UniProtKB/Swiss-Prot annotation:
Region annotation (Keys region for toxin activity) ranges: 31-33
Keywords per UniProt: Disulfide bond, Knottin, Secreted, Toxin
InterPro entries named among the record's database cross-references: Insecticidal_knottin-like_sf, Toxin_28
Record's GO cellular component terms: extracellular region
Superkingdom of the organism of origin: Eukaryota
Main subcellular location of this protein, as a coarse class: secreted
Listed name of the protein: Mu-segestritoxin-Sf1g
């Protein structure tokens, strides 16, 4: 299965699909609502 490239918006249901980590402005999966509204993007492995 392919992973999602860095910069791809990641959500709570697919944050494990990032090639690296699902990063939010306040840290990885910092606040559930940030993930839900699309503020988080795939980035380098934390």
């Amino acid at each position: 299965k392919e992973c999602m490239a860095d910069g791809t918006v990641c959500y709570i249901h697919n944050h494990n699909d990032c090639c690296g980590s699902c990063l939010c402005p306040n840290g990885p999966l910092a606040r559930p609502w940030e993930v839900l509204v699309g503020n988080c993007k795939c980035g380098p492995k934390a």
